[in-house]
Amino acid sequence: MSGGMQNGTQETERRVIDINDRHTVNVGPQHPATHGVLRLIMELEGETVTRADPHIGLLHRGTEKLIEYKSYLQAVPYFDRLDYVSPMCCEHAFALATERLLGVKVPERAQWIRVLFAEITRILNHLLNAVHLALDIGAQSPSLWGYEEREKLLTFHEAVSGARFHANYFRPGGVSKDMPTGLAEQIWEWSEKFPKFLDDLQSLLNENRIFRQRLVDIGVISAEDALAMGFSGPNLRASGIAWDLRRAQPYDKYDEVDFDIPVGRHGDSFDRYLVRIREMAESLKIIRQALKAMPEGPIKVQDHKITPPKRAEMKRSMEALIHHFKLYTEGYHVPAGTTYTAVEAPKGEFGVYLVADGSNRPYRCKIRATGFSHLQAMNLMSKGHLLADAIAVLGSIDIVFGEVDR
C-alpha cells in the first residue's frame, strides 16, 4: 500500500472514531434549567459541547395573528403574556406605538407613572434572573432572598392594576387608573431599604469562589459578535457597547432623569450578571427621581374616543355613556400609517412594528422579541465548554419563551 493511501485510510479511521466519540443529548423541553420550553439538541464529546442547536416554537400561540382580530384596546393583554416576567415593559412599547399613530400626547403624570413602573419591572426582571442564575449553578439561598424581595414589588403591581403579573396597566393614552393614596410613600420607603438587600446579595455571590469559577470566562461573546447577532440590552452592554434606548432614543420622561449605563469589559457570563446587578441600582435612582418629579393631574388623555370617561361622569351624561359603550364594543379607529417603536425592556430592545389601515384593528403587528437574537448565539457561546457550563450560559442571557415563541 502506498504511503498516500495509508495516510488517507488512517485519516478516515480517525474521523470515524471522532464521530463515534460524539453523542447527542436532548436538554428540555421539560427541564427546569431551560427556563421554559426550550429544547436544546447538544452534541457532546464526553462532557464538552461541540454543538448546541436550540429548537423553539413549543410556546407559539400565534399572538401576532390574534392581535389582528382584536381592537387596539383588546390587544394590550396579549403583550403581558409575551415576556411574562416583565409585562409592563411590553405593554409600554405597544402603547407608545399606538399613541404615535394617533398623534396624542400623554399627560405628564401618566408618563412619570410609566417610567416608575417600567423601572420597578426592570428590578423584578433582573432580580429573578440573578437569583435563578445562582440556582442554576447550585446556590439555593439567593433565590429565597430574591423571591421575598420580589414579593414586595409585586404588591406594588397589584396595588395599581389589581394583578401581580398580567397587569394590563399601560394603555394607549396613559395608564388604566391612578396610583392609590399612600402607594408613592410605600415605594419610597422600600427604595430606602433596597440598597442594603442589593449589598447583601452581592456579598453572597460576587466574591464567592464557586460562583466566579462557574461564570468568569464562560460564554464569552465579543462586541463585534454581539452586534452581528443582534444583541441588545444587558447582554450587549456586558460586551462593552454602551447602548441603551432610554438614553439614545428617550421616550416618556427618560430624557429628564439622570442615570448611568453599566458596561462590562469581558462579555462573559459573570459580566452579564454584574451588569444586571448594577442596573438595579440605576433603576432605583430613576424610581426615586420619578417619585420626586411626579406632578398631580390626569393619568390619561381627555379624549373619550380613546380613553373611557369616569364612572361618575357616565351616571350624569348620556354622551359619556355612549363613549364608554363605543370604546368597549367597537374601540377607536387609528389613522392609516406605520411605525416601529421600541423600548429598553429589561432583556433588551423590545420593538413593535405597527401597521394601521384606518380601522379599529391593527392591520399588522410585528413584535421584535429581545430573546430571539440572544438565543441564536447559544451555539457560539457554548461551544468548547462543559455541558454544565452551557446551562450557566443559558441562564446568563435571560430568556423567556413567551416572547421568543410568541
Swiss-Prot record:
Q: Which InterPro entries match?
A: NADH_Q_OxRdtase_suD, NADH_UbQ_OxRdtase_49kDa_CS, NDH1_su_D/H, NiFe-Hase_large
Q: How is the subunit organization of this protein annotated in UniProt?
A: NDH-1 is composed of 14 different subunits. Subunits NuoB, C, D, E, F, and G constitute the peripheral sector of the complex.
Highest taxon of source: Bacteria
Gene name for this UniProt entry? nuoD
Spell out the reaction equation it catalyses: a quinone + NADH + 5 H(+)(in) = a quinol + NAD(+) + 4 H(+)(out)
The record's subcellular location field reads: Cell inner membrane
Record key words, sorted: Cell inner membrane, Cell membrane, Membrane, NAD, Quinone, Translocase, Transport, Ubiquinone
The species this protein was found in: Acidiphilium cryptum (strain JF-5)
State its role: NDH-1 shuttles electrons from NADH, via FMN and iron-sulfur (Fe-S) centers, to quinones in the respiratory chain. The immediate electron acceptor for the enzyme in this species is believed to be ubiquinone. Couples the redox reaction to proton translocation (for every two electrons transferred, four hydrogen ions are translocated across the cytoplasmic membrane), and thus conserves the redox energy in a proton gradient.
Task: Kindly report, in one word, the top-level EC class recorded for this enzyme.
Answer: translocase
- Quote the protein name from its UniProt record: NADH-quinone oxidoreductase subunit D
Q: Which Pfam families match?
A: Complex1_49kDa
Record GO cellular component, one term: plasma membrane
- Return the similarity comment: Belongs to the complex I 49 kDa subunit family.
What GO molecular function terms would the record report? NAD binding; NADH:ubiquinone reductase (non-electrogenic) activity; quinone binding
User: Any keyword Magnesium?
Assistant: no
EC number of the protein: 7.1.1.-
Bilayer disposition of the protein: Peripheral membrane protein
Q: Which PANTHER family does this UniProt record tie to the protein?
A: NADH DEHYDROGENASE [UBIQUINONE] IRON-SULFUR PROTEIN 2, MITOCHONDRIAL, NADH-UBIQUINONE OXIDOREDUCTASE 49 KDA SUBUNIT
